[in-house]
Amino acid sequence: MPRRRVIGQRKILPDPKFGSELLAKFVNILMVDGKKSTAETIVYNALETLAQRSGKNELEAFEVALDNVRPTVEVKSRRVGGSTYQVPVEVRPVRRNALAMRWIVEAARKRGDKSMALRLANELSDAAENKGTAVKKREDVHRMAEANKAFAHYRW
């Protein structure tokens, strides 16, 4: 722990097209080797495709997809007297968003479609319909937390 002042979290600039901080964070997570303009192009193309499929506007469709992937509980390892327990803990809102976005990008990268924009659009539309790899990941995390509910009293 720092003995001096606590440094605040950096303010993220909203993305130029929609003015959304959440979308700017998503672009940053998708970005590889500092190529932000490439990442922005991929995200905007994916959102355009997603909006055409769903009939909603881009931000709404993105928000719905993200909402279906956000975890509410996760497990953390806790050592108690020589044995390690998987203790279920509630996920803070900022981490919820971060995990959801990370899982969506991971799942999109593993897909076998043509372009990254198409892969991302497909993963987001799957997430909006409550299916796909990212949603499965969230369900697995929730299942782990449910299975280890007995150790919830070890929370710190």
Swiss-Prot record:
Gene3D superfamilies: Ribosomal protein S7 domain (1.10.455.10). GO terms for molecular function: rRNA binding; structural constituent of ribosome; tRNA binding. GO terms for cellular component: small ribosomal subunit. Signal peptide: none annotated. SUPFAM superfamilies: Ribosomal protein S7 (SSF47973). Pfam families: Ribosomal_S7. The keyword tRNA-binding applies. Keywords: Ribonucleoprotein, Ribosomal protein, RNA-binding, rRNA-binding, tRNA-binding. GO terms for biological process: translation. PANTHER family: RIBOSOMAL PROTEIN S7. HAMAP family: Ribosomal_uS7_B (MF_00480_B). One of the primary rRNA binding proteins, it binds directly to 16S rRNA where it nucleates assembly of the head domain of the 30S subunit. Is located at the subunit interface close to the decoding center, probably blocks exit of the E-site tRNA. Belongs to the universal ribosomal protein uS7 family. Part of the 30S ribosomal subunit. Contacts proteins S9 and S11. This is Small ribosomal subunit protein uS7.
